[in-house]
Amino acid sequence: MQLLYTILKEIADAILFFFIQVFKIFRYFFYPEFKNCSKLATLLRWLTHFWLFFGLMVLISASGFTSYEEHRDVLYYFKRQFVFCLIGIVISNILMHFPLTLLLKYSNIPFFFIFGLTILTLMPNIGISINGARRWIAVYGFLVQPSELIKPFWVLQISKIFGQWEFLTTRTKIFWLIIFLIQIVAVLIQPNLSTASLLGITLWLMGLCANFPWKYLLGTVFVGLSMAITSISLKPYQLSRITSFLDPWKDPRGKGYQLVQSLITIGSGGIFGTGYGISLQKTGYLPIHYTDFIFAVYIEEFGFIGAVSLLLLIIFYFLLVITVILKTNHPVLRLVGCGAIILLMIQTLLNMAVATGIFPTTGLPLPFFSYGGNALLANLINCSFLIRLALETKDRN
């Protein structure tokens, strides 16, 4: 009981501190452009902030027990996430000051910089290997994951190329297709099948949105599936994820343990949940409960009602962005909106599908909920493009 009291007190203090600091940041970055912007832009902006803040509150609860057990600090993981939150808010608000056409003009710079970092992760003396995967580079005590950070700039660069595809020379087209392929293969080699698949699917769907001929799209599907099958056949742990997904109860204490515990966690929530901060499964039963499987802990604490409410919020967010895209006349900017929302929704829905046993374990985080500073930064930058698009839609229409 004393431990529970300590955890709850620390959580309450953290929430108070969090909102005070966020309020100060918003006051600093609240600029006049939002005072006269469309209702769509305002609503999209505040929905993004709500998603972010609510996700951080869920993370405080989901990570509290493990933080105390491993570091004797209930807020250890939250504090680290909060640092990235502040950095992300600053960067995203700065980016929202600039027209998307300007960001597209100079998108090559961050894209190739992070592209280079992705290649460096494969170098033995530079890339850091964790659990057999070489995906990180250490920078001042923080682990930088280029495959996460490149996601928003992946959208910008694809939009820039695909949006003016018919005006490009054959040589330029081949060059960029090779660059995109190298990026996907580099992530696949790390190995990181889930992120490589996400980048590939985003590329394919943006090609679909750009009205690429079906003969090219179907050809890339064959190439993508071949790469995925090859990766799975060469990496036994990826194959075991699929076999354990098909029948997790066959080996509930072995390969199926993660999914079985996730389903138990979700079932424990019932209709209304156990209450915020009172999850039992996060106390050592459900592995990676504050990262890839945080959605299961969320359902345990908020129940079926909470799960449906979150899903409705995400659907509303999606429809709001679609409305903005339909109001956008500029073809390249429309592609930016399509790519950004595709990236956000695929990660969200796949993470939920994995936690509920609908899809094999992927390793994709739940945007704004899962612990991971690199993913948080990428998602905030990605959403800043959507908000900026909503701002510009009013001006252009």
Swiss-Prot record:
Which GO terms of the cellular component aspect does the record hold? Answer: cell division site; cyanelle membrane; plasma membrane
Its subcellular locations are:
Plastid, Cyanelle membrane
| E.C. designation(s) | 2.4.99.28
Q: Which reaction does it catalyse?
A: [GlcNAc-(1->4)-Mur2Ac(oyl-L-Ala-gamma-D-Glu-L-Lys-D-Ala-D-Ala)](n)-di-trans,octa-cis-undecaprenyl diphosphate + beta-D-GlcNAc-(1->4)-Mur2Ac(oyl-L-Ala-gamma-D-Glu-L-Lys-D-Ala-D-Ala)-di-trans,octa-cis-undecaprenyl diphosphate = [GlcNAc-(1->4)-Mur2Ac(oyl-L-Ala-gamma-D-Glu-L-Lys-D-Ala-D-Ala)](n+1)-di-trans,octa-cis-undecaprenyl diphosphate + di-trans,octa-cis-undecaprenyl diphosphate + H(+)
List residues traversing the bilayer.
Answer: 46-66, 82-102, 109-129, 174-194, 198-218, 302-322, 339-359, 367-387
Which Gene Ontology biological process is one annotated for this entry?
regulation of cell shape
Task: List all disulphide bridges recorded for this chain.
Answer: none
Keywords, alphabetical: Cell shape, Cyanelle, Glycosyltransferase, Membrane, Peptidoglycan synthesis, Plastid, Transferase, Transmembrane, Transmembrane helix
Output the Pfam families linked to this UniProt entry: FTSW_RODA_SPOVE
Task: Enumerate the InterPro entries for this protein.
Answer: Cell_cycle_FtsW-rel_CS, FtsW/RodA
Give membrane topology per the record: Multi-pass membrane protein
As one GO molecular function, the record gives: peptidoglycan glycosyltransferase activity
Q: Which PROSITE patterns does the UniProt entry name for this protein?
A: FTSW_RODA_SPOVE
Q: What is its biological role?
A: Could play a role in cyanelle division/peptidoglycan biosynthesis.
Q: Which family does it belong to?
A: Belongs to the SEDS family.
- The name of this protein is Putative peptidoglycan glycosyltransferase FtsW
